[in-house]
Amino acid sequence: MKFTIENEKIVGDLGFGSLPISPNDTIGYRPYELFVSSLIGCSGTLLGNILKKKRVEHKKIEMIVSSVRNPDRANRIEQLSITAYVQSDQSLSEQNALKIADLVIKNCGMIQSVIETIDLTFLVKTSTLNSDVR
């Protein structure tokens, strides 16, 4: 990976293409957005693979993140809550959803990199196509 710093932004020259990074969200992705995106990219892909191995066919997974940051400590992230909403024709029991969430936490390299410094929760909720989220 190669990064070039110019003016108010950094441009990463990565395998997929260039990635503009800046604290100014009109000229690049904010570092916070990229940090959270890396966690979602890793955990979301892993969740999809786990569901496939468990033969839980799903139409879509939506992931919502909320965070708590500490302005007194360089605005660091102190807490992240990730909720994955799985849309499927079949529902998961609460026990299976908890087991799957635990597998994601234990096997996601990005989550494991920060789990000791950030209070992180990961929830899996399912909804069948004709029902509400469970």
Description of each model-found segment:
Residues 1-38, 48-134:
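Extended beta-strand/beta-hairpin segments
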Residues 42:
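Alpha-helical metal-binding/catalytic segments enriched in His/Glu/Asp
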Residues 45:
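Short glycine/serine/threonine-rich phosphate/pyrophosphate-binding segments
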